[in-house]
Amino acid sequence: MPIVMARDLEETASSSEDEEVISQEDHPCIMWTGGCRRIPVLVFHADAILTKDNNIRVIGERYHLSYKIVRTDSRLVRSILTAHGFHEVHPSSTDYNLMWTGSHLKPFLLRTLSEAQKVNHFPRSYELTRKDRLYKNIIRMQHTHGFKAFHILPQTFLLPAEYAEFCNSYSKDRGPWIVKPVASSRGRGVYLINNPNQISLEENILVSRYINNPLLIDDFKFDVRLYVLVTSYDPLVIYLYEEGLARFATVRYDQGAKNIRNQFMHLTNYSVNKKSGDYVSCDDPEVEDYGNKWSMSAMLRYLKQEGRDTTALMAHVEDLIIKTIISAELAIATACKTFVPHRSSCFELYGFDVLIDSTLKPWLLEVNLSPSLACDAPLDLKIKASMISDMFTVVGFVCQDPAQRASTRPIYPTFESSRRNPFQKPQRCRPLSASDAEMKNLVGSAREKGPGKLGGSVLGLSMEEIKVLRRVKEENDRRGGFIRIFPTSETWEIYGSYLEHKTSMNYMLATRLFQDRMTADGAPELKIESLNSKAKLHAALYERKLLSLEVRKRRRRSSRLRAMRPKYPVITQPAEMNVKTETESEEEEEVALDNEDEEQEASQEESAGFLRENQAKYTPSLTALVENTPKENSMKVREWNNKGGHCCKLETQELEPKFNLMQILQDNGNLSKMQARIAFSAYLQHVQIRLMKDSGGQTFSASWAAKEDEQMELVVRFLKRASNNLQHSLRMVLPSRRLALLERRRILAHQLGDFIIVYNKETEQMAEKKSKKKVEEEEEDGVNMENFQEFIRQASEAELEEVLTFYTQKNKSASVFLGTHSKISKNNNNYSDSGAKGDHPETIMEEVKIKPPKQQQTTEIHSDKLSRFTTSAEKEAKLVYSNSSSGPTATLQKIPNTHLSSVTTSDLSPGPCHHSSLSQIPSAIPSMPHQPTILLNTVSASASPCLHPGAQNIPSPTGLPRCRSGSHTIGPFSSFQSAAHIYSQKLSRPSSAKAGSCYLNKHHSGIAKTQKEGEDASLYSKRYNQSMVTAELQRLAEKQAARQYSPSSHINLLTQQVTNLNLATGIINRSSASAPPTLRPIISPSGPTWSTQSDPQAPENHSSSPGSRSLQTGGFAWEGEVENNVYSQATGVVPQHKYHPTAGSYQLQFALQQLEQQKLQSRQLLDQSRARHQAIFGSQTLPNSNLWTMNNGAGCRISSATASGQKPTTLPQKVVPPPSSCASLVPKPPPNHEQVLRRATSQKASKGSSAEGQLNGLQSSLNPAAFVPITSSTDPAHTKI
């Protein structure tokens, strides 16, 4: 694949490939380079990691651009490359465009690089990045060129070799010194000393004089991290990024010796100070001067406000960087010439750490080989993402498939006859030789630039020098936020004598890049003035604020939609990278590659006197322009005419849309229903795009995964509820939890796209119906449709969210978005809606009602915007929880069913627990005229911990709502769906019931109660369709017929005496394996009863006021009884006793008959036992934690466990029958009354496990608690059964 390619200028575009080339010429990610602008180079956009624009990815994907990362893990680099269509290959692969490594490269790897391949390190870069080598190189330059010329390091000694010199210096000045390992980073192994005896000489270390007069801001010490890019060492080309980081210590600076060991005071490394408890981080990318990490521009602006000379400061910083790199230039340039086959194969980003003292003199601390690209704060992401994107653009990745390379020879014109770039047009002539191609390139360039421009500038240059000259010019055209500090128009005169690598390339660049610069002979003051103006320009660039990625994204989209960006014959800059100054406009006017953007002044083509006279006119305006203009703005310099008065004409693109919809809505305007639906559809499309994007630069941590999981859960909830209101059936296939996170996001995005399609169709149908009626209400006029459509095309997700939130707040309802009902009843295994069409539409309107926040920022990254439209239920649920602790009189709100976090049947896993309350079946259901109110809730086999009333459910990696698995079909009920449905819902209250009441009607005496902490309180307003209830009852009837019930389920506590009869057939074994018989009341044909005895007080207890009953001792309804009641009410057949005795259990029948005959005696027994043990058990009730509450991890469904043959968890010993009672299976008559009295009298007072005591405690606890509605629990461990 040739890098320099000639083309026939007379060739016409006649083939389809020609048309493709033309269509790609204006692509925002392509910049054309080479002699005839035939070589496409990729342009990177920092905001691509947020947008995941397919238009940006298409170039990289088309040419199979690839990268590999070796011995490091840079998520930011990976995310930027992936967003631009690159794909990652194995570290051992040889087909790549970029190798990003964290260590030095071996010579044999460098030798095999092709011209299109690039690596991020130069050979022998350790000459700069190792502290000992850096020290030696600078000391050598001090000896050669003078100490003052290279006095950029504090006084330093290399130990143990120079220990004697160090002791001699210490004896003269007993100040503090700082010790550093020669090859470490991030502050590891760094400490301060004030005596040579404190130093360990076991390894090589560097000892430097501690700068005890650092520049302080608010009494805190700080240093500056600068990002320096070197693209070539022969010739030397250095760029400094216009933004950096100021890193502050976390403890106020104090020179006292007592604080010499306090690293948080003396060290400014982020890796050290982030461990301090005083470290402050800023979460707003727009705030750059807060916390322990500032932007460099914010620091410079602060110093300028304090009256400091920031222009001179940054000029000294540039001087320090240039001299540092020059000190290692010879060694690195020699290694490049030896090992690197192509000049453009290597580039390197250095991290310079500079400390500024109180006199504004910068001191070099160290140079980092691979500066940290971690983004621990939004400010890091804004600066580092912009810097990396601009660096990749400057380096220049040629759009070429790495697998198609045919040769690795260093002379790249010889690629001409081997491979062609797919972008390039087919040549009708024969392949050109290297010399022919180069000459034709030069001719073509001369034609494009005009006679006398570039044509004359290359006279006398070799082919290699021409290629180097063109590459350096093209790099500067793509520099973005980088500022080229070497070479400039003055650097050769200042630093030329310091260069040790004696080649002609540096001099060639100095003379050819700035060949038109004014000679300063006889006018040295003009030379100084030119230097000052250049320094002011650079200082203004360093001080201006960097735009956030979100603003860049909006600006680029706005400029692309308007298509107003002018085209230049040389530069095709992206929107973010067009930072135009007066000197840059001169370059665009002349369209010559040999003009320097930042260093060239307009007066260079005029006389010295003319510069002196007119420089005062444009220099202040230039500085003011850059200071008041943010980086990467959209201003365009249209004209720069020196002869016409040196005025700068600016054309500013309008960033704000002309049509301000929010202003119209606030001025009593309104949207029509169709416009509201269109805006909502556009919002959902933004959400879909956000789901389809990759993780970007986010850290794959537990918190990030939890947040992503929560966002997907919001989408799932929305789809389930919204699809239920569609007129058309829509199948929702939800992703499995076993899939990868990104794969689940992709599936959800696909499902959301399907929903949007159906939603848009229904919107069109609604529009057609309205157009046929020809009757429009006054409020349906809405805003101007053309302006509205333009707003929809340009609006961002944040703007749409703001409009929809305001519209919902203004109209008091969001039902227009999703409707209020559907034609048919649509249910799923997680939620239900009203079965009848039109039933309580206000219910759904309340569910989708949006509660906007009090304050809303449109510039934030909206990662959870969908929750504004789907989680209003959560907001109402929190209000319910906060009020639930107020007692039975707490008013319950209506909560949408989408807040249901999990739905469990007997074989499903539990979800987060919420407090629930009882509700009643409407009396209007024909098939159930007298059915008592029940709850068809189930409890999972392993109950999860419950939330305390009023507690807030905070998402966490292990405890947040999960994305449901399986398929969700809108259509008729299946048996499984209906079962899950009826077991996960509460029956709604009748319309005559008092709003917010949680009590049961006292006339409904046959009520069974239950608690379930996995259910939400969000289903109060829901009703069952009659057909749905009938289907479920039929299923329960079939289940009842085939189920074998445990006999122990319906034997009262009095049957404990039967255990002394030694019953046969294993009845007692099953009884002990199940729950205590006391907890399982018998359900008689006439209704549920609590005892087989005739208790005259029972009806009174059943109908007593609920307010007088304890919540801790409330009654419970077991699943078996609930199903039996449902069965009896549905079929009209009175079910038999749940225990059907077999042929071998006749002894039990006899025992029960005997018990019936002993009712009066038992009653007397109870009275006497109560009187005898009143002193022991009188003050005791049955605690929740001992009798009624099982362990959270234990199984709670006793009836199900018994029916399935599994052993449920046994209760405490004091309610379990004595082991001796089951020693024999021979039935015996019950003991007479006198024997029982004697036995009870002989029992010790400390024993509370006797049958009489148990019966007394149980009876006293059950009687006052019969049929108490359980609204909430005050015991965190209270497990609802």
UniProtKB/Swiss-Prot annotation:
Binding site for Mg(2+) 1: D353, E366
GO CC term, one of those recorded: centrosome
Annotated stretches, region: Disordered: 577-614, 1072-1114, 1199-1281
Function comment: Polyglutamylase which modifies tubulin, generating polyglutamate side chains on the gamma-carboxyl group of specific glutamate residues within the C-terminal tail of tubulin. Preferentially mediates ATP-dependent initiation step of the polyglutamylation reaction over the elongation step. Preferentially modifies the alpha-tubulin tail over a beta-tail. Required for CCSAP localization to both polyglutamylated spindle and cilia microtubules.
Gene Ontology MF term list: ATP binding; metal ion binding; protein-glutamic acid ligase activity, elongating; protein-glutamic acid ligase activity, initiating; tubulin binding; tubulin-glutamic acid ligase activity
Protein name: Tubulin polyglutamylase TTLL5
Notes on the domains: The flexible c-MTBD (cationic microtubule binding domain) region mediates binding to microtubules. It is positively charged and becomes ordered when bound to microtubules: it interacts with a negatively charged patch on tubulin. The presence of positive charges in the c-MTBD region is essential for proper binding.
UniProt biased composition (Acidic residues): 584-604
Residues that, per the record, bind Mg(2+) 2: E366, N368
PANTHER family: TUBULIN POLYGLUTAMYLASE, TUBULIN POLYGLUTAMYLASE TTLL5
Similarity section: Belongs to the tubulin--tyrosine ligase family.
EC number: 6.3.2.-
Binding site for L-glutamate: R247, Y270, S271, K293, K384
